[in-house]
Amino acid sequence: MHNESPIIRRKSTRIYVGDVPIGDGAPIAVQSMTNTRTTDVAATVAQIKALENVGADIVRVSVPTMDAAEAFKLIKQQVSIPLVADIHFDYRIALKVAEYGVDCLRINPGNIGNEERIRSVVDCARDKNIPIRIGVNGGSLEKDLQMKYGEPTPEALVESAMRHVDILDRLNFDQFKVSVKASDVFLAVDSYRLLAKKIDQPLHLGITEAGGARAGAVKSAVGLGMLLAEGIGDTLRISLAANPVEEIKVGFDILKSLRIRSRGINFIACPSCSRQEFDVISTVNALEERLEDIITPMDVSIIGCVVNGPGEAEVSHLGLAGSNKKSAFYEDGKRQKERFDNEDLVNQLEAKIRAKAARMDESNRIDIKVQN
């Protein structure tokens, strides 16, 4: 029930990764990347489907060898979500996966080779209507840029990106997006800010190699939050040393926090104190686990006492304000006559949330696909 985001997004051009629009005001797409052996087709397909189930719009798959390219062909046949092939070193792998229906090619300027090889990839992408991501990374800059700047700097990352933007411009290819990732928050943020002033293409955001599930989520939230709040970013990937499913959850949580794009329930819950009339923490944990399948955007406040409980409930779709033995229940900001037994809050509130979701959105789906 909170207002729309006040953020004014940067204007950018539009490309499509499969049927998912990127840029020009399209919903910010949330991506992840498989961490299975690509040659293990069954495991990779299973992970892609798990990512799709938690809301991934696009999935990137590493294709390091020709054997992996042949496996990619089989993987693509078994999934419906758009796939990006992550290509390093050997441009011929990009040409091969293009034959197998890849939806986007990610190439790294630091290791893909000379302009002639890039031309071969671009010509193939143009013929098959495949977009490209120029993916610059602070850990793999070209050697001459390492020598010139001494260390990764925003200017170095952006110069690397612009070299390849210029190549694509000369080849009259405009179906691309760009990323300038770094593991340092300020380096990444300053690089994206600088790049955003130079080009109109969509920007893919990420803090690369951010760390484990907790630290990586915090680092990504800080860095990407700064950029998104400034309107920079058209698609994102949270890089965690964790189950890729967590990357999607964190990505949506960041977008949800900024009211840019909502998926599922936004739980507003107090950290609890001695005033709580029920166990807030266990209640929230249980509901989060039970209701992962609900993707209809909804604010649900769960507050353990009457200090802030009524106020939060009045601006939520559903709300609970703790009281002795039975807690007050709110819907659409209005207190209901019905009260919930504090010993059975999880079951009662789950039923109310599911019923509310069904009324708000019968299909319980969010469609990122928008019209031109």
From Swiss-Prot:
GO function terms (MF aspect): 4 iron, 4 sulfur cluster binding; 4-hydroxy-3-methylbut-2-en-1-yl diphosphate synthase activity (ferredoxin); 4-hydroxy-3-methylbut-2-enyl-diphosphate synthase activity (flavodoxin); iron ion binding
Necessary cofactors: [4Fe-4S] cluster
GO BP term (any one): terpenoid biosynthetic process
Pfam families recorded: GcpE
Keyword tags: 4Fe-4S, Iron, Iron-sulfur, Isoprene biosynthesis, Metal-binding, Oxidoreductase
Note on how the cofactor is bound: Binds 1 [4Fe-4S] cluster.
Signal sequence coordinates: none
InterPro entries associated with the record: Dihydropteroate_synth-like_sf (IPR011005), IspG_bac (IPR016425), IspG_bac-typ (IPR004588), NO2/SO3_Rdtase_4Fe4S_sf (IPR045854)
Stretches that traverse the bilayer: none
EC number: 1.17.7.3
Residues annotated as binding [4Fe-4S] cluster: C270, C273, C305, E312
Pathway entry: Isoprenoid biosynthesis; isopentenyl diphosphate biosynthesis via DXP pathway; isopentenyl diphosphate from 1-deoxy-D-xylulose 5-phosphate: step 5/6
Catalytic EC class: oxidoreductase
Reactions mediated catalytically: (2E)-4-hydroxy-3-methylbut-2-enyl diphosphate + oxidized [flavodoxin] + H2O + 2 H(+) = 2-C-methyl-D-erythritol 2,4-cyclic diphosphate + reduced [flavodoxin]
Family, similarity comment: Belongs to the IspG family.
UniProt function note: Converts 2C-methyl-D-erythritol 2,4-cyclodiphosphate (ME-2,4cPP) into 1-hydroxy-2-methyl-2-(E)-butenyl 4-diphosphate.
Name of this chain's protein: 4-hydroxy-3-methylbut-2-en-1-yl diphosphate synthase (flavodoxin)
Taxonomic lineage of the native organism: Bacteria, Pseudomonadati, Pseudomonadota, Gammaproteobacteria, Vibrionales
Gene: ispG
